[in-house]
């Protein structure tokens, strides 16, 4: 009975990255031996145990055989005669098929260390194509390690495209697609995840609303990159630089979905694309079962991002109404989130990456001014019932108007 550290912990240690989770494989043991040693069994589908002290996961070495459709259609075989090499063979990428023994020696039967040096994401065996979830996993790894120069091997890209072409992605549950997407959105380069999916034709299957933006032009004066799909990924790149918040990054991804609905006869203009995009955001989020708070911000950003760009000329009444519409009084974080997504939109354009975005600062200033109006003072002044809200709104508009005269003076004449 021997235990080996496996997978991501070995990979990240070799890359000099922090190791977060440590997983182990046990060779030559039975479930009863693990229980007798004080381990707690937690795996339903195959034997996984928690260490009595560290609570880290220890799985019995196993092999997998395809027995049904999708990423759950596997029959597992775990027994003392399963070797470490056989266990590592079932893994997705060579860089994940690494193990380390108790003495620190690396076991690398499939060339994972060489691929780490080459910065290559390459599948271990042809069995890669039996699991459609691996299309998303590899796209996520590509995003996670893009800053280190990793790329996907051509032969692995070909297998990913074959999985998509065979219709295997239909077997993925919405929850699993969202989980992988959410994880990809936390990486340094989330745009790589979506570009990778597009390269293997998976984007139009899983995110047709985003795929529809490719080939849709915008006015070259405002969008030198012209293509709305390119612009979308440029804004996601910028959002990742501006904020670690998944809500902000996802909302940025969805901000221009409405442009995919513009009739070709009206191109390259997209009047009203913001409100039009709200329904597409709802559609995408319902299909992937995106959490409500993330969905709601994305809807607001789709509807109002163009309005924020015109902030210096907005009427005080319009600004206060905007704060009402985004429910800022109860969810004040939305003001900052919407400011960041709007900035990502403006800077996510060819040649505008280093642009200043004063509208974001002005939005936050206007919010501070509107928020400073005291509800207690309104109540103390004798207003009751519906009058309180009306007077609050009046005072907020007056305060924002006074601030705006100083910060955004209008030209005379």
UniProtKB/Swiss-Prot annotation:
This protein's record includes keyword Repeat: no
Catalytic reactions of this protein: a tRNA precursor + 2 CTP + ATP = a tRNA with a 3' CCA end + 3 diphosphate; a tRNA with a 3' CCA end + 2 CTP + ATP = a tRNA with a 3' CCACCA end + 3 diphosphate
Keywords carried by this UniProt record: ATP-binding, Hydrolase, Magnesium, Metal-binding, Multifunctional enzyme, Nickel, Nucleotide-binding, Nucleotidyltransferase, RNA repair, RNA-binding, Transferase, tRNA processing
Binding site for ATP: 8, 11, 91, 137, 140
Misc remark: A single active site specifically recognizes both ATP and CTP and is responsible for their addition.
Domain note: Comprises two domains: an N-terminal domain containing the nucleotidyltransferase activity and a C-terminal HD domain associated with both phosphodiesterase and phosphatase activities.
Subunit structure: Monomer. Can also form homodimers and oligomers.
Stated name of the protein: Multifunctional CCA protein
Species this protein is from: Klebsiella pneumoniae subsp. pneumoniae (strain ATCC 700721 / MGH 78578)
């Amino acid at each position: 009975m021997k235990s080996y550290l496996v997978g991501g912990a070995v990979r990240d240690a070799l890359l000099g990255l922090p190791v977060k989770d440590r997983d182990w494989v046990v060779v030559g043991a039975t479930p009863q031996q693990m229980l007798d040693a004080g381990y707690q069994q937690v795996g339903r589908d195959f034997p996984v145990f928690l260490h009595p002290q560290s609570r880290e996961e220890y799985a019995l070495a196993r092999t997998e055989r395809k027995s049904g459709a999708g990423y759950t259609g596997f029959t597992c075989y775990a027994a003392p005669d399963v070797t470490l090499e056989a266990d590592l063979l079932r893994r997705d990428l060579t860089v994940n098929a690494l193990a380390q023994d108790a003495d620190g020696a690396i076991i690398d039967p499939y060339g994972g260390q060489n691929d780490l040096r080459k910065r290559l994401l390459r599948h271990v065996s042809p069995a890669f194509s039996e699991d459609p979830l691996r299309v998303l996993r590899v796209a996520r790894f590509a995003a996670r390690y893009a800053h280190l120069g990793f790329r996907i091997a051509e032969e692995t890209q070909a297998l990913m495209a074959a999985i998509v072409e065979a219709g295997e992605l239909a077997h993925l549950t919405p929850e699993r697609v969202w989980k992988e997407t959410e994880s990809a959105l936390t990486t340094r380069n989330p745009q790589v995840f979506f570009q990778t999916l597009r390269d293997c034709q998976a984007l139009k299957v899983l995110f047709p609303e985003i795929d529809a933006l490719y080939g849709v032009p915008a006015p070259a004066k405002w969008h030198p990159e012209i293509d709305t799909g390119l612009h979308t990924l440029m804004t996601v790149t910028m959002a990742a630089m501006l904020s670690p918040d998944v809500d902000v990054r996802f909302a940025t991804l969805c901000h221009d979905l409405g442009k995919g609905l513009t009739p070709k006869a009206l191109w390259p203009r997209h009047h009203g694309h913001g409100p039009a995009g709200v329904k597409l955001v709802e559609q995408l989020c319902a299909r992937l079962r995106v959490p409500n708070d993330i969905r709601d911000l994305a809807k607001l950003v789709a509807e109002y991002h163009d309005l924020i760009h015109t902030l210096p000329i907005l009427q005080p009444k319009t600004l206060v109404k905007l704060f009402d519409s985004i429910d800022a009084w109860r969810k004040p974080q939305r003001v900052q989130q919407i400011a960041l997504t709007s900035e990502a939109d403006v800077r996510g354009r060819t040649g505008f990456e280093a642009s200043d975005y004063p509208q974001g600062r002005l939005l936050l200033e206007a919010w501070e001014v509107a928020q400073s109006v005291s509800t207690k003072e309104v109540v103390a002044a004798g207003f009751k019932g519906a009058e309180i809200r009306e007077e609050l709104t009046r005072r907020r508009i007056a305060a924002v108007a006074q601030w705006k005269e100083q910060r955004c003076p209008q030209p005379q004449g």
